[in-house]
Regions:
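A detector for small-residue-rich transmembrane helices and their helix-helix packing motifs
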Residues: 1-192
Length: 192
């Protein structure tokens, strides 16, 4: 495991300088395989487990995705895998000449899965682990995006808030490309 192998960890982590200047494009994907610690990994996998099955099932539903439902599992995996590099694009462009910028984890892709759920079920009660307050998913999503945006502008700490933001937006938009009617379904659910 990369937790105990610093050399492997360093080869897999996202480093914008190495991607941009050394053409190590595999880092756009590989950073999702390593995490900053056990808690980081456990939280990402827990959230993926909580939301992933519903998204996978919905992608396989002929009502929501009449033209692509037979490829539901494939589309779910495709969206997740594409979300990994897409969520890293802001950091790539912003940090491309910074030797010292690194990031790890799958949080951007996991955020994509959460926001697909928000698109599909905007009234679903959502909250934060260990905090007993829940909000409708679309309100939670707005607050999450606002928080991620403002924290990314502060550019402090070791959390890739820009990856969370972009991953979330990608997870909301990707299913709409598959079925544009989902946006009407979303609007109907939040207005009725």
């Amino acid at each position: 495991m990369a937790f105990n192998n610093q050399e492997l960890f360093n080869k897999l982590k996202f480093n914008a300088f190495m991607v941009w200047n050394k053409r190590e494009f595999s880092r756009l994907f590989s950073h999702a395989l390593v995490h900053g610690g056990w808690l980081h990994l456990i939280v990402n996998m827990y959230v993926l487990w909580m939301f992933g099955k519903a998204v996978e099932t919905t992608f396989s539903d002929h009502v929501f995705f009449p033209k692509t439902y037979s490829y539901g599992k494939f589309l779910y995996v495709l969206m997740y895998v594409l979300a990994v590099p897409v969520a890293s694009l802001p950091a790539l462009f912003k940090q491309k000449n910074n030797h010292y910028y690194n990031s790890v984890g799958a949080s951007g892709a996991v955020s994509a899965i959460v926001f697909t759920t928000i698109l599909l079920a905007p009234d679903l009660p959502l909250g934060i682990i260990l905090i007993p307050i829940q909000l409708p998913a679309y309100i939670f999503g707005i607050l999450y995006l606002a928080y991620s945006y403002f924290m990314s502008k502060k550019d402090k700490g070791n959390i890739a808030h820009d990856a969370h933001f972009v991953g979330s937006v990608f997870g909301f938009i990707f299913p709409i490309f598959l079925n544009p009617g989902l946006i009407h379904n979303f609007i109907f659910q939040i207005t009725h």
